[in-house]
């Protein structure tokens, strides 16, 4: 489970309720005991319930959870219920709903992409990038993990990944062996990934024997050529594909023999529909 600090939870709440609920106050219904229900409209994967629970508790509402992160539910399934005064419930309503809707959307797409990849290659791994919508990375990470996905990397300090923009600043940007040797010396605990923009680059860099070569925005036929070359040279280098990889084409790459898929696609899908009902006790 991803840890969310009090500040992060407060920031989510204060974006919507920084001056209270004017409508509830104007109708003088703040102190009416009530209950709130959150239901998933369509069948699918659930994510965000752990964050939703914390948000409700921040408003002194004690929630009841009926599902766990990553659980598959039927349409209309009750995810969370809670009881409290109308004022608190109305303040919680939209923030919790949005967290659930967006998280479930990310998780649903991730789960479908994983299923498509594993239908061809049971060892396939779908890893999501750091290219999330700004200020949503932790929510996105929580949703991806709930769906059974992996994280490519959370930030630039986590892995060694050499892009062309790094090499542009080197005195000899095409000395792949020197680049790999330097990285092995400076960060011996980390695997080394080089990104190949095209097949011509790949033909040069594979001889330096990095741990992983990431193929960015490659056509299927070029990916196959790269795989065939490594096999013919008996090089034990893992290939990953990135750039435009989504649930609709992941199986095409898997059929070639790729097992590591780098994607940002889950972050930009429509949210799932979470129905919310508030009613008197």
Swiss-Prot record:
Would the keyword Disulfide bond be found if you checked this record's keyword annotation?
no
Matching InterPro entries: Aldolase_TIM, ModD, NadC/ModD, Nicotinate_pribotase-like_C, Quinolinate_PRibosylTase_N_sf, Quinolinate_PRibosylTrfase_C, Quinolinate_PRibosylTrfase_N
Can you tell me where the transmembrane regions are?
none
CC annotations in GO = cytoplasm
Which enzyme type, at the first EC level?
transferase
Its GO biological process terms? NAD biosynthetic process; quinolinate catabolic process
Q: Which UniProt keywords apply?
A: Glycosyltransferase, Transferase
Key word Zinc present: no
The GO terms describing molecular function are: nicotinate-nucleotide diphosphorylase (carboxylating) activity
Record EC number: 2.4.2.-
Which family does the UniProt entry place this protein in? Belongs to the NadC/ModD family.
Q: This chain belongs to which protein, by name?
A: Putative pyrophosphorylase ModD
Which lineage do the record's taxonomy fields give for this organism? Bacteria, Pseudomonadati, Pseudomonadota, Gammaproteobacteria, Pasteurellales
